Amino acid sequence: MVETNSPPAGYTLKRSPSDLGEQQQPPRQISRSPGNTAAYHLTTAMLLNSQQCGYLGQRLQSVLQQQHAQHQQSQSQTPSSDDGSQSGVTILEEERRGGAAAASLFTIDSILGSRQQGGGTAPSQGSHISSNGNQNGLTSNGISLGLKRSGAESPASPNSNSSSSAAASPIRPQRVPAMLQHPGLHLGHLAAAAASGFAASPSDFLVAYPNFYPNYMHAAAVAHVAAAQMQAHVSGAAAGLSGHGHHPHHPHGHPHHPHLGAHHHGQHHLSHLGHGPPPKRKRRHRTIFTEEQLEQLEATFDKTHYPDVVLREQLALKVDLKEERVEVWFKNRRAKWRKQKREEQERLRKLQEEQCGSTTNGTTNSSSGTTSSTGNGSLTVKCPGSDHYSAQLVHIKSDANGYSDADESSDLEVA
């Protein structure tokens, strides 16, 4: 037997209305909560509870309130049918469009762009939202999330941002000067660098950072800072004493402050310590003459004590020396010659005094000398060797080169 659903010929099927069909179906009640609420409700709560993202939470909450106002406006404008099916479909479509619009508004570009454009109106919107935040409660999966922010925590006021940032920032020590970050730095610059980094005193740096340098360098740094402080103290005391008529740079003018002389010595030592070793004195170069060169020079000196430039240049070519060296040699040789002559004159004078020493007793000896009387009654004693001494003096003074002590009074120079 084959069963078919088609009616036999001549008969028609007629469905009688049921009891449920006759009764009017009540309109379906559809919840008007926004679609996909679990995602951004929780995100909004997290952003609002975060201290660093207060503006983003306010922005999201304002978007949700705008959507709620749009839903209420569309509900008042859309007519409902008898069975309520058309209105329910319209509401669902509006909810989907609102969810898509909200998702498009949650992008980073849209949020940051609106922040840059509406930077001036952000505080007023934030205050309005924070005032209405206590009345609006957002529900998600049966859990009520109350969004409450007090006036002290609201980021709309600039004072709260400054206070929160000040509270969140940790207390840090004073910054170390850049020139002290190298342990190999010379200790001479330690006092100035520590004074620039710490306003109280240079020793504050060593107290705050005891392990900044190794042991030996730390001890040297402490000693140098102490010396710098002592120097500043002494300079201040000297400046105070300068008002009483004493000069601060003369230690002899302060009999009650004997440490000022030691201060100058220590200051000189510190200057050498800070700027390295003192500059060395330039050593003068000495020319060592050979025997042949000395013979040529002595022969020329016997002829003349003052050779001209042409003669010095010719002599320099002969002895293979510079003309400046030859000039210096002649200058030194003349000084040596003057010294020898002075010694000879002194020796002859002493010899004459010894020969004439016997006449000082007032007695005259005819064998040792002759006595002559003058018209004024004075006696003149003439020693026998006085003529020879006078002749030697005349020979010394009468130089063939015309030399005199007044011509050149310089000492010996290095050739």
Swiss-Prot record:
What PROSITE patterns does the record tag this protein with? HOMEOBOX_1, HOMEOBOX_2
Biased composition range(s): Basic residues: 244-284
Q: Could you name the Gene Ontology cellular component terms for this entry?
A: nucleus
Where is region (Disordered) located?
1-37, 66-87, 114-171, 238-284, 336-383
> Which Gene Ontology BP terms does the record give?
negative regulation of DNA-templated transcription; regulation of transcription by RNA polymerase II
Pfam families, sorted: Homeodomain (PF00046)
UniProt keywords, alphabetically: Developmental protein, DNA-binding, Homeobox, Nucleus
Superkingdom is Eukaryota
Q: Which GO terms describe its molecular function?
A: DNA-binding transcription factor activity, RNA polymerase II-specific; DNA-binding transcription repressor activity, RNA polymerase II-specific; protein heterodimerization activity; protein homodimerization activity; RNA polymerase II transcription regulatory region sequence-specific DNA binding
Q: Does the keyword DNA-binding apply?
A: yes
Q: Which InterPro entries match?
A: Goosecoid-like_HB, HD, Homeobox_CS, Homeodomain-like_sf
Family per similarity comment: Belongs to the paired homeobox family. Bicoid subfamily.
Could you tell me what this protein is called? Answer: Homeobox protein goosecoid
Species lineage: Eukaryota, Metazoa, Ecdysozoa, Arthropoda, Hexapoda
Tell me the gene name.
Gsc
